[in-house]
Amino acid sequence: MRSWKVIFPGSLYSKLKDFLFSSSPKENGCFLMANHYKAGPTKSVLIVTKVILPTHNSWQHAGESSLVPTSEFINKAVIEADVTGLCPIFVHTHPSSHHPPSFSSVDQSTNFRLFQNLNEILSTRPLGSIVISRRGITGVVFSDGRLEEILQVTAAGLELKNVQVPQMNDTSSRLNSKFDRQVRIYGEEIQRLIQRMTVSIVGLGGTGSSVAVQLTRIGVGKLILIDKDSIEETNLTRVYGSRLTDVGKTKVEVIKKHLRSFSRSTKVEALQKDVTKDDVLDKLLQSDVIFGCTDNLSSRAILNDVSIQYYIPLIDTGCRIHKLPNGKIDQIVAKIQVVTPDTACLWCTDSLDGVAILQETLPEEERRKLELEGYRESTDKQPSIISLTSIAASLGVNKLLQMITDSTTDSRTEIELSIPIFISDRPKIKQGCICQKRRGIAGLRKVT
């Protein structure tokens, strides 16, 4: 049987809760519209893109212990779902409860009638019902003729909230004593959240390998490592865990072996694949967060699309060292940018260049010709050093920790070491950017 995850844009979830509890002590509710996708053989995801608010005549009954929608309100949701191809989710509150929520007998009767009515027209898509109290959230999905549990609810914004679902909060699970120092900082529940996370890292060079080591040491539950390349001699100065005897071996396997040498608690999956050519989308969709650690613009554009279409936060990390013609270094930069449903994407901040991406796809001979003619800057063998790639990796990992502890407001951080200067800001979503059309559309557009 499948389990389900529901992802809200962080800002939408915050506004939704404010609205739902505004009628307290009476129950309140609405319909949500969501796209859905599979995130592995036994897990599916609903991503909320729209809210249908009630009017004064949307309830057959609204009291402190029950809430029943009218047939008209249900029909309104059916029509919206039928026209848009989205999945309807009925959500309501138990505002007076100070316990983790569960469906009452009235709720169960409402769910039965709701699913029966919706299924007559929307039989090929999942149908959901959620109840929220001040102590958490629970829900079910009716799909393929059976009820399945919602086991995870995430509000994906700069604050990456994992909303409490009763089945997920196993407070009896014992934490390994090796995490004592960080538990003293963040507390036991945050450590348990870290240990439940699945994180993909695309690009396992100096930055990506450092990210992998740091995430493993803080106890992330599973890492998915993706890189097509093998260790070269010049990688030995930057790639964590690499040795002289590793030259010629795949980066992902070398780093996986290194991670296993100091931790057995983090599961590691190593994929020697090219994110621009190989089908790795199904693996990326299993992630709670994606780290982009590649300087290839084509792969960064793909990860940007995955993030905005599927509501999976992306932490894009990078370094840049620029030298003048006379050999003097005039720029040493480590930077990260977080892409979420609520923040600017990489196109918004001009971190991506359409012409440069097109040039990357050209045959090598044509790329070399453009470089010789001065129409393209060579991206081969760019200067790099472990001290800088490690700074970028640490910025990214610290940003993730800030996101899950609700302690960040900025989506972009940049350190210019040659001046030096530290910049932290939240760029605005650019008017007319393609991300506004692609947010939350999931598989309706192929990621290319």
PLM regions with names:
Residues R113, T171-V199, I231-T245, R264-T266:
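Short acidic, glycine/proline-enriched helix-loop-strand junctions
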Residues G187-E232:
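Glycine-rich adenosine-cofactor-binding loop
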Residues T124-L127, T266, Y310-I312:
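A short helix->loop->beta-strand "cap" motif at the edges of active sites that frequently abuts
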Residues V220-S263:
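Glycine-rich phosphate-binding loop and adjoining beta1-alpha1-beta2 segment
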Residues G248, V252-V289, T294-A301:
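A structured beta-alpha segment of the ubiquitous adenosine-cofactor-binding alpha/beta core
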Residues M1-I89, P95-P166:
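Conserved beta-strand-loop surface patch within small alpha/beta domains used
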Residues F115-I121, S133-R146, Q164-D170, L175, ...:
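Glycine-rich phosphate/adenylate-binding loop
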